[in-house]
Amino acid sequence: MPGASFPETEDGLIWDMLTELPERLKREESCLGGIMPKRIYLAGWSQSGSLMITYTNYFAKADFEAGRKPVYDGWFSAGPAPACAPALNQSECMDAEAGDNKIRFAGVPYLEMHTESENAFLGTAAAKIDDSDDPQLQYRFYTIAGATHDAKSTMRDYYHDDRSDQDKVGVFFVYPGKEPYPNDFPYGMAYCAGLKCLYDWVEKGMEPPKVEDVSVNADLTNQKDEHGNALGGWRLPEIELPVCTYQQFSTPLVKSESGALYGSEIPFSVEKLKGLYQDVTHYRRLVEEKADEAIGKRLLLPEDREACVEHAVAKAIKYGLEGGC
């Protein structure tokens, strides 16, 4: 795959690994020390999520046609890049326009969650399929409004106190944008809620919520509301009660494609914040109400309510909202 592997290589080894690992984990002499897993899920982020497209279409389907039990009980694909989905036994990516990288088989529940970044830049729009309850293609698709593929939390905060892993591989995540504020939307909370929805789907037969997708224009850019934020999608309080415009991109200081994935925030003026929310006390009350609504819709875990509220309020204070506590 361009930028990710050498042209003379292909991804055969990973298919073996993805197939053999769950089988080994289910053996009594496995590396889990005799603990037998009740269920095994496969989760992938970004390019790893794109590999799941190839794996489900070919290997999971082959198991089904041969009468074998599924090796996984559920699929969780987060921020996948369909444009990077490799063709079987080849180094080249599959043809998005021809629909080769569309999910055609799952066998067990498959939940796919995107940020706003992937629509045009990573081929999601061309590969998207409709939600399905077909027994062989139980599938849900979501886009987290306000979120971008790369964000402050995943690219900076997680490594704040320990950069040893980055040192080992010589890769350092630096915000590339001219805009002063990188995207700091708390999309991890949405992913946690989505994963819980998948667990409930597999273990309890409880179907995930239906969520209207982010609306897009003809050029695949996302349609915006009066604040410049996305319409539709998986919505957390910070997009329902915004204090900034969440841009899908940042403007690189030097020529680079990294800004297409690393979003930015444009704060509202203090006057606009006061006009919308009065003061911090009133804003907190509104966020708490929206958090409870999101929990009721299964878009936010009850365990994340406090963190969700505090994150939103802290950002409002950061961008100039005052008054109360």
Model features per residue range: what roles?
Residues 1-325:
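C-terminal His-loop and adjacent cap/lid subdomain of alpha/beta-hydrolase
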